[in-house]
Amino acid sequence: MFSIEKNVKNEIIINKSKFITYLIRIEKIEDVKEQIDIIKSINKDATHYCYAYILNSVKHFSDDGEPSGTAGMPMLNVLENNKLNHILAITVRYFGGIKLGAGGLVRAYTKSVTSTLDIASIIKIDFGYSFKISCNFDKKTLVENLISNLKIENIFFDNKVNYTLNCNKEQFEIVKDLLNKNEIEIQELKEVIIKSE
């Protein structure tokens, strides 16, 4: 599975119409509406807000008033052809006064997403876990040896040493067993998308 490493924006002009495409990494379906609302608030005077997204097995698109099949579907095709997932493409169009016709719109929306992908950093992604562990100071060295192969997102100290970690599912199963054997409790476990090495 592939996605973008970070969100990216690009703008092209075709026959006086401005096409601004945003590629946004999404984790859950609620992200789609939230991101579309944000883009609409930034581009209040735009004529169309077309989009396509892929989130696991869910795929959806919208032409937002453009002729049927001329905007959202071509955008979705670009995402599918690049084997992307957990991604939302929103293309905002400011009409420039020249009608492009159905074929011209398909080419314009395709080019807008493709040219934005050209400047994006594409990464391989995998399902994994984010979790926290805490230990007493006397177990700090032991814990750090047990988690040495994991990505440590954060370490903070209070009356204990607290770690926030990310890892893939296979790593998690191994580390979970090691932590349990050493009586170190896993907290706030949640499934996340991680960059695959």
Describe every region a protein language model picked out:
Residues 1-70, 154-156, 169, 181-197:
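C-terminal regulatory domains involved in ligand/effector binding and gene-expression control
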Residues 24-27, 133-137, 164-170:
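Short beta-strand-to-loop capping motifs
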Residues 53-54, 85-95:
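Glycine- and acidic-rich phosphate- and metal-coordinating loops
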Residues 80-85, 107-123, 164:
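Short Lys/Arg-rich amphipathic alpha-helical segments
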Residues 121-137:
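Short glycine-/aliphatic-rich beta-strand segments at the starts of folded cytosolic domains
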Residues 133-151, 174-176:
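Short amphipathic alpha-helix segments
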Residues 151-172:
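Non-DNA-binding regulatory cores of transcription-related proteins
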